[in-house]
C-alpha cells in the first residue's frame, strides 16, 4: 500500500545513510505485481545508490513467485532464494526462500557452502524457529513479516506467537533484528506502531 511518492521518500532517506548494501526481507509485492507496474515502482528501487538484495516473503508467493521474480528483476534487486553471496570483504549474505515454500532448503544444507570464517548475515522473511540460525552459527539474522502488529493491540498477539515479533534479540553468539518494515498491509494506516528502516553498522 505504499505509493510511489512514499517509496521515493524512503529511498531518499536510505540513500542519505550512504549504505554499502540495502537488504530487504521480502514482501515487496502484495498479491499482485500490477499496481507496482502501473505506478512505475521499479524505477524507485533502481534509485538506490547501493546494491539491493532481498529474499521472498509470503505475499510475494501470493502474487505468484514467477510474477514476483519478474518485478524484482525489473527493480534491479538481487533476489536470493536459498543462495549465498559475498557482499563485502569478509561478509556473506544468505537469503532463504520463504517458508511458504515447503520444499525450501534446510538452513544447515545452505550453510555447508558458506565459509565459516566470514561474517554471515541471514535474510529470512518470517521470524519462526530463531534457534535454527543460532545452531548454524549465523552471526546476524534479519527478518520482517510481522509489521510489529501494525495496529495495536495486534502487536500483543504477535508477541505471543513469535519468540521475537519486533526489535533486537541475542541468542548465544547470534544477533537478530525483526523489523516492522516500511510498508503496511490491509488498512492504509498504523496505530501504535511505526514504519522503519534499520541501519546495521558492522565494526
Residue ranges and their predicted role:
Residues 1-203:
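Soluble catalytic domains of enzymes that build or remodel membrane lipids, polysaccharides, and related
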Amino acid at each position: 500500500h505504499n505509493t510511489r511518492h512514499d517509496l521515493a521518500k524512503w529511498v531518499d532517506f536510505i540513500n542519505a545513510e550512504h549504505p554499502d548494501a540495502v537488504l530487504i526481507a521480502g514482501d515487496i509485492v502484495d498479491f499482485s505485481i500490477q499496481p507496482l507496474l502501473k505506478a512505475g515502482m521499479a524505477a524507485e528501487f533502481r534509485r538506490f545508490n547501493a546494491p539491493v538484495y532481498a529474499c521472498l516473503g509470503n505475499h510475494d508467493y501470493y502474487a505468484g513467485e514467477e510474477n514476483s521474480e519478474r518485478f524484482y528483476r525489473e527493480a534491479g534487486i538481487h533476489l536470493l532464494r536459498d543462495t549465498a553471496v559475498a557482499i563485502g570483504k569478509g561478509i556473506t549474505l544468505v537469503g532463504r526462500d520463504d517458508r511458504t515454500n515447503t520444499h525450501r532448503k534446510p538452513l544447515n544444507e545452505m550453510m555447508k557452502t558458506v565459509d565459516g570464517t566470514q561474517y554471515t548475515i541471514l535474510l529470512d522473511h518470517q521470524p519462526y524457529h530463531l534457534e535454527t540460525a543460532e545452531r548454524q552459527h549465523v552471526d546476524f539474522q534479519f527478518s520482517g513479516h510481522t509489521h510489529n502488529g501494525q495496529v495495536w493491540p495486534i502487536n500483543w498477539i504477535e508477541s505471543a506467537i513469535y519468540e521475537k515479533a519486533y526489535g533486537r534479540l541475542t541468542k548465544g553468539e547470534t544477533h537478530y533484528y525483526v523489523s516492522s518494515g516500511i510498508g503496511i498491509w490491509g488498512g492504509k494506516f498504523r496505530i501504535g506502531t511505526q514504519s522503519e528502516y534499520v541501519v546495521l553498522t558492522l565494526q
